[in-house]
Every structure is written in C-alpha cells, then in structure tokens.
Amino acid sequence: MLCLSAFAGVASVAEQKRQNPLKVLMIGNSFSVQMVTAMPPVAKDLDLGLDICSMYIAGCSLRRHWENICAPTTTPYNVTRCIDGIAAKAFSGNIPEVLTSEKWDVVTIQQASYLSWRDETYNPWGGNLVKYIREMLPSAKILVHETWSYTPWDKRLSDWKIDQDEMHKRLCLAYSDFAKQYGFDIIPTGTAVQLFRKRLPVKYAANSLGGDVVGSARFIEKD
C-alpha cells in the first residue's frame, strides 16, 4: 500500500483529497526546488491533493537562511508554487512573509550540499531557524530534507580528501544528528539517490530534475 510516509502524522489520506490539499513549504536550495515539479504528478496518481511551495536560493545554507530572516526587508528568495498540478506565478520573497502567508501543514528545511557533511555547520543557525518556524507557525510539522553527495569526479571531493561514499555517510550522520535534536523526521532523498546510483552499471550524476525525480520516490514509499 502506498502512503505519504514522509508526512506521516500530519493528516490522514482522507484529509489529503483534492478539496483539502496538503500544504508543504520548502525552505531550501537547488536540492529542493525541483520537487515543485516532481511531486505533483505523484500526488495526482495517488489521488491526493498537494499544494507545494519552494523558496530557495542556490547554495543557501542554514546560516544564510537565518541571516535572511534577520534582514526581513530583503526578498532574496525565488518562490515557486504548484497547487494540485497548476503552477502559480513565481515571485521574489522572504521567509517571514511566505511562512505566514498560509497555514502550512509541513515545512521542510535543509543544509547547503557543500556543508551537509560537516555537522558543525548546522547549529546554531539551524536551531534558530527551527525556533523561528515554531514561533511563527506552531501547528506545522517540520521535516528535514536530506541532500545527496556529489559525483565521484567533483573536484570538491578531492579538495576535501573524501570520496562520494564518505560524503554520503557523513551527511547522513549530520542530518540524523540534527533531526534527533528536535525529534524531526527526515525525508531521505540523499539515501534514495545513493541507492539508485549503486544499482546502475555506470556512474550517475544526479543533476537538476533527474536527482529530484529519484529523490521524490522517498516522499512516497511502500509499507
């Protein structure tokens, strides 16, 4: 049986029908933005209503998200939204205004990919972000949206003296430790991408939409 495992506890399947779509806000970077196009077809196939919104800056870290909250007069985010498969007009915005514009059921957060494997980069900024979301939207369920490791030939891996598997191992541990501090569930898109890579006869680069299509499978899984 198919279920919205990543959103477990938010609402029942019956409550997710199209007349009452699940409202999801993603505060992230380029590793989350394509979910706006990848997830609606999946939700449609399951006859589930989905209102999904992404606010992102490429390469945006938890620290930068927090610093942007501290400068609310700026609108540095590209905001895209899709309501039951219908795309809304994109606009520039900031976290305070978008977070309070709707009664979001779910808010996802993630670390920048280049910092994701370094656990010391998550706090205090991630904790500040969590506290702010809870204060502004106490009814929302916060989920940690995992990113994935780089391709084996990415120069940054050699600069860091680690390989793809080591980056994946460390980012999983860092995300897990961060989520456990607050009792959050993780959307394990990075793990899904890594498992997919291992099944391929060639090395796989999870670029743009490709990686997110693979990752979106982890929003919905079999019981």
Role assignments for model-derived ranges:
Residues V33-G126:
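Conserved SGNH/GDSL esterase-like catalytic core that processes O-acyl groups on lipids
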Residues F91-D223:
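Alpha-helical cap/lid subdomain in secreted, periplasmic
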Residues V13-D45:
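N-terminal module-boundary/linker segments of secreted carbohydrate-active enzymes
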